[in-house]
Amino acid sequence: TTKISEILWNCSYKNLTCYYSEDSYIQNNISLKNSKSFKKPLSPDQFLYCGEAPLIVSRSLKGEIVNHIKKYKTFPRVIILKKDIYFVAANVLKAREKEDVFKAQLYFNSKSNPNRPLSKNEVKKLTSYNLFKNRLRFWFDYTK
């Protein structure tokens, strides 16, 4: 967690906490083989808390974080390093909230019913608004 925090600090993201998830459900159900099930957000909440996509580190941690920041214009909120999951947030409480939302997505995708991720247009719409202020409005738009 210290190394991730240092990389983020060097990328001008100060005051962020990196939280290592010890949740047994997440540890048992996360696999790079099933990464399609968690690569795209299923709901506005997941987009809000976990970002557009988790960072799955396959090479250099520093290089992958820098590339993620360039691609998505923000820091990675979920970092997957082999079987280890890290949540990045302003504090531990916010990181645990992200952990709960990510866990819910894993649970919903573990069921036999296929779930439809947010479309590119929905992600674009969510990106253009202040998500925290308009959270409930997005949910009502999403369920139509």
State where each predicted segment sits.
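Glycine-rich flexible loops
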Residues: T1-K144
